[in-house]
Regions:
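Short, electropositive alpha-helical surface patch
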Residues: 59-74, 160-169, 222-228, 252-267
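An N-terminally biased module of ancient metal coordination in phosphate/nucleic-acid-related enzymes
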Residues: 1-59, 258
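H/E-rich (His + Asp/Glu) clusters that bind or coordinate divalent metals
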Residues: 177-179, 183-291
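Hydrophobic faces of well-ordered beta-strands that scaffold small-molecule active sites
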Residues: 2-6, 49-52, 76-79, 107-109, ...
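A generic "structured core" feature
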Residues: 1-2, 6-9, 123, 133, ...
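Active-site gating/metal-coordination segments in enzymes
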Residues: 58-151, 158, 200-206, 212-213
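Short, acidic/polar
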Residues: 30-40, 86-99, 185-186
Length: 291
């Protein structure tokens, strides 16, 4: 099986320094490496990981690139490329191509509702830099992975209509249920994105939605709606590990890696064995590893 979304970092600050402004006290844990995750995940059958660039490394992808190079076929990466910046840097599409050569094959974009205000209007993707990223994603089969909330859906819908060939991922079930309830209008809006054939959804981060208590059964209704709309071929399971983050009440124990897996593997009885194989392995394998 494949975990399509984990965060990792090292405590070797000399070799992999934190970005300016960050210090070791900012880290959720002293370290959280791919090896740490795999020690927990492999006994459960989860043997491959998508490493999502951690905030405190900024734009320096050295750590995940090094991990991927040391673990070919086991690790793959999602990076960060700024589409809009006030400093002189590479064109975002050129940066995407360069990073893809290091095994970083998806690129995270934060939605307007999921980041600090930048002074942009409702069409927050209306910028030549984002056009370049969408175009490059189509031409190179590099996914754009969106950390968004439901209010961001209309703008993403507009861009997916403009660039229908670009692979797009919605992280964390679009944040639905993060405030407790699972509003029908938000679920319908997310499911409406299924009209775009290259839009996929990461199903997970169950610790952060609904009652926020394992076994997370209150998330099953949302999972069912999303899988029915997108099909299991466009859904992939994630944990968003680490699941324990000191200072964050929503991620304190008893959240466990196995509980996140068990919701799909054991409790989603509306899914067939084939559906579960696609969600837990095949969708992520096809997008990230079968290149």
């Amino acid at each position: 099986m494949i975990d399509s979304h984990v965060h990792v970092w090292s405590d070797d600050f000399e070799r992999f320094p934190l970005a300016p402004g960050f210090n070791p006290g900012n880290l959720w844990l002293t370290r959280y490496t791919p090896e740490d995750i795999l020690r927990e995940s492999r006994p459960l059958g989860v043997t491959r990981l998508n490493l999502v660039q951690m905030t405190w490394y900024g734009l320096d992808h050295s750590y995940i690139a090094d991990a991927i190079a040391r673990n070919p076929g086991v690790l793959i990466g999602t990076g960060i490329v700024p589409a809009v910046t006030d400093v002189s840097g590479p064109s975002p599409d050129d940066a995407m191509v360069a990073l893809s050569e290091q095994g970083i094959v998806a690129f995270r974009i934060r939605g307007r509702a999921a980041r600090p205000a930048l002074g942009d209007g409702p069409q927050w993707l209306d910028h030549p830099g984002y056009d370049k990223m969408f175009r490059c994603g189509h031409e190179r089969n590099l996914a754009l992975s969106f950390l968004i909330l439901p209010e961001d859906i209309p703008e993403l819908n507009r861009m997916c209509a403009r660039f229908p060939g670009t692979p797009v991922i919605i992280d964390h079930l679009c944040g639905i249920g993060s405030k407790g309830p699972f509003p029908e209008n938000e679920i319908s809006a997310l499911c409406g994105l299924a009209r775009h054939p290259r839009v996929m959804v990461k199903i997970g981060a169950f610790y952060a939605r609904g009652a926020r208590k394992p076994p997370y059964l209150d998330s099953l209704g949302l999972v069912r709606r999303v899988v029915e709309a997108f099909g299991p071929d466009r859904c992939m399971w994630e944990t968003d590990a680490p699941l324990t983050r000191p200072g964050s009440p929503e991620t304190t124990p008893p959240h466990t890696y196995e509980a996140s897996l068990a919701l799909i593997r054991d409790h989603a009885d509306f899914l067939s064995a084939s559906d579960k194989e696609k969600i837990l392995t095949k969708t992520a394998e096809r997008l990230f590893f079968a290149r």
